[in-house]
């Protein structure tokens, strides 16, 4: 069974609710909600999404309630094509919002009142230093192409100091806010959009900190905005989700994952024995919460930057590209890429999203590095996405080799989560580091890491994976770049992150020469 089905019942109690209302209101509700769901799915990610129909049947849940009621069979968990969508956080949000809009339209039609849909979250968030010790927090509203009433009329800015909780927020009708800051403390900000329909989900989090007598200003750019389903493939006689290769990225947390898929054989699709049928999974995580993208990594990076003696601001990668946040004003840039990589949704008809280095970002970084900038980049797919990704081009590879001074040496670079510093460069501590490679409720899992090779004069290996000696980090003293094939924020502890960040910034901004393996 493929597609969406709606169920209602009109024949109970002579076709009337207890208050006398016609039970055909349940049919109206079902039709409106289903129409909204199917329309939104077809317009965004699957133009051939199937609308199965409306059933007037005496299901208990449709028959007993004394108010307009519907049952929604959105998709089938036994259908691989459906679950490629159903496992994706973007699809879950799209459908949930469509259900909300459908219910709102139904209530509006019953009472003959206009309705307003809550806005979408804002984007292009940035926190930069302003005059008089203040910080300017700015963003861009997002217009909903599926709903004209969802335009924001104002915003609420929430503030967190150091590792405390967020406050109750400050309202503004403009897409920016000046915030007072106490030197030496980290201020974090998230923004919601509001209108008569309600308040949007919160934006990602940006942060800033002024260090008295600091060594310089660093800009943290969050380029990790990916949320997606696990890697899925259908080839010849096999189909399924390959969570050991790429478990996807939940939106903050996931409670639906129960374990990795074990049976991929399409010949077992009709098997009635659950444990050996197509799609059979382990159950070792069925009571666990799985961590995902917290959208709060500028704070994690910034805390280590501040402890190294540098002031920092932060911005989303969209703010750098769309609104022109200037990199040239900063001594160094820390680009967060986490598990960012080009991925599709469902069968891929909507194209790719979440590329590590978009053409616009490449142009911005080229200009910054040509002007004597200093750049730190970390992520699981910094090379894979530019060499073998779905949107990879020769220009991408040239950018990596010419600007960032590394080349691709393979993915799945390590089976163990240990990295050691091997360079003789005096600026790096000869330490060993560990990154998170298991499921945790508050951290995302790193399934794969990239192996890199130095490219160009002055580039040298800094770190290697312990289990196979492949290169995990490349630096270039002449161009002041440092690139890691695993995410910085995935390191096990604050102590490890603080030590490594101090070494990296000392190398990038300390004027020391390169070293050899």
Regions flagged by a language model, labelled:
Residues 1-31, 55-78:
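Active-site microenvironments of hydrolase-like enzyme catalytic domains
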Residues 215-224, 231-243, 324-392, 482-484, ...:
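Short alpha-beta junction capping motif
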Residues 48, 406-494:
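Catalytic beta-strand/loop cores that center a nucleophilic Ser/Cys/Thr
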Residues 178-199:
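Beta-strand-rich modules
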Residues 48-113, 485-490:
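Active-site-adjacent mobile loop/cap segments within catalytic or ligand-binding domains
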Residues 205-331, 336, 502-516:
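Aromatic-Pro/Gly-enriched surface loop or interdomain linker
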Residues 106-149, 183, 197-216:
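Pro/Thr/Ser/Gly-rich low-complexity, intrinsically disordered linker/stalk tracts
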Residues 339-443, 459, 500:
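A glycine-rich, often tryptophan-bearing local segment used as a flexible ligand/cofactor-contacting loop or short
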